[in-house]
Regions:
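Nudix hydrolase/Nudix homology domain
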Residues: 2-19, 131, 144-198
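Unchanged
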Residues: 86-175
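Short helix/strand-bridging catalytic loops that position acidic/His residues to coordinate divalent metals
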Residues: 79-87
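Residue-level signal for pocket-adjacent positions within structured domains
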Residues: 39, 48, 73, 80, ...
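Short N-terminal secondary-structure initiator segments
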Residues: 1-26, 93-111
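Acidic, metal-coordinating catalytic segment for phosphate/diphosphate chemistry
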Residues: 20-56
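N-terminal strand-loop-strand
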Residues: 45-80
Length: 198
């Protein structure tokens, strides 16, 4: 399997270095992610057994009232869309957008290039080796009348109202809260915020 190129590592450092968060826990994780990137030239490769960066997307519908979650086959729980970086990914934003597009089947997704949330968790990847995912989550908006298409990577794919999320959804409620705060700030500023079209 071809590994992601050096540009991905460089751009991951740039992305996390330029992002600021007022949350002390998230700031500690940001520093930890940057430290991991500094220590591991292959930090974005799934072959890095100590752990590797992954990219996720909290996908909201055009109204901002529902989020699209996948019933993950390995984890057995509803999660946000996302996954490993691939050779064609030049940065974490493109990786998150690619994963969201592949797993949702929706074209025309738009992504905010600023990280929304960071999380590190222990997993056993497809290689069968226990490792850690240093997950960088982004906010993605679906176009009006978007129709999702179930892929082989999901057991199920479903829109959930933000006020009625399923039980045991990991940190999805935290991400939803952060997304709402960001949307409110953008509305006050009279802008939808920066977006990158898919």
């Amino acid at each position: 399997v071809t590994a992601p190129g050096p540009d991905l590592h460089t751009n991951a450092v740039r992305c996390l270095s330029s992002w600021r968060t007022a949350d002390p826990g998230q700031e500690a994780l940001r520093q930890a992610f940057l430290g991991f990137l500094a220590a591991k030239a292959d930090a974005c490769h799934r072959s890095c057994e100590a752990g590797h960066l992954t990219a996720s997307a909290l996908v909201l519908d055009a109204t901002g009232e529902r989020t699209l979650l996948t019933l993950h086959p390995r984890v057995g729980r509803w999660l946000q869309l996302g996954g490993h970086c691939e050779p064609e990914d030049t940065d974490l934003v493109s990786a998150a957008l690619r994963e969201a597009t592949e797993e949702s089947g929706i074209t025309g997704l738009r992504i905010d290039p600023r990280p929304l949330h960071l999380d590190v968790h222990e997993v056993t990847c497809s290689l069968g080796v226990p490792t850690r995912h240093f997950d960088v989550r982004f906010l993605v908006r679906a176009p009006v009348a978007a129709r999702e298409v179930l892929s082989a990577e999901s057991l199920d794919l479903r829109w959930f109202p933000l006020a009625a999320l399923p039980a045991d959804v990991d940190s999805v409620p935290t991400m939803v809260s952060l997304a709402m705060t960001r949307a409110a700030g953008a509305a006050e500023a009279g802008s939808a915020g920066p977006v990158v079209p898919g």
